[in-house]
Amino acid sequence: MNKPVIAIAIGDPAGIGPEIALAAVLDEGVHSRCRPILVGSTEVLELYRAQLKLSCTFREILAPDAAEFAPGIIEVIEVNGPPLDSFSPGKSGSACGKAILDYTGAAVDLAREGKVDGVVACPHTQQSIVAGGIDFDGYPGFVARRTGTHVNNVFMMLYTDTLRIVHTTLHIGIRAALELIDIDRVVRALRATDR
């Protein structure tokens, strides 16, 4: 059986997302479960590869079916990021806001088109997105709008080897959350968890 192909959006170019993405694709445990492809800027990834002194090579591909998944080679579907001189690692800013959603949107589109089996979105910095003038309520709402799914039918899952946690509400105040939670919503969250 072929392992699933997972598109990993690299997150905030100025944040920890690219580091996490690189650590994931270089981890043998990840490769034992899936075939990862990064979605983002090769230039940004090269910046972090050099800073972290990682021994790997990037290979840009146009589509997931061109991936070879060879050891030490990280396949990247290129999505332009901000110019390297427009941001500093560790400092959120408007230059990175658009890139965060461009990377994630491209990964979600690959899944929607059936070209990958799943998407992982590395950490984003909401401050960067808002500083870029973008109205943003979190990844789940973004994914819902990108896929034409009603926002009430999208859930965020935290997943480990032994535990799955699905939030029934996201990014709202406690009073609004309590008003939204009902049996139907809990059942929808459970069904999403069981997929």
What kind of feature is each model-predicted range?
Residues M1-Y139, L180-R195:
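Contiguous, glycine/small-aliphatic-enriched amphipathic segments in soluble metabolic enzymes
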Residues D27, P64, A144, V154-M157:
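A generic local secondary-structure boundary/capping motif
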Residues L52-K53, T147, N153, I172:
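A broad structural signal for alpha-helix termini and local helix breaks/kinks
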Residues V79-L84, N152-F155, Y159-I165:
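Flexible glycine-/small-residue-enriched beta->alpha junction loops
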Residues V130-F155:
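Glycine/threonine-rich beta-strand-loop-alpha-helix active-site module
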Residues L158-R188:
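Ligand-binding beta-strand-loop-alpha-helix segment within the catalytic cores
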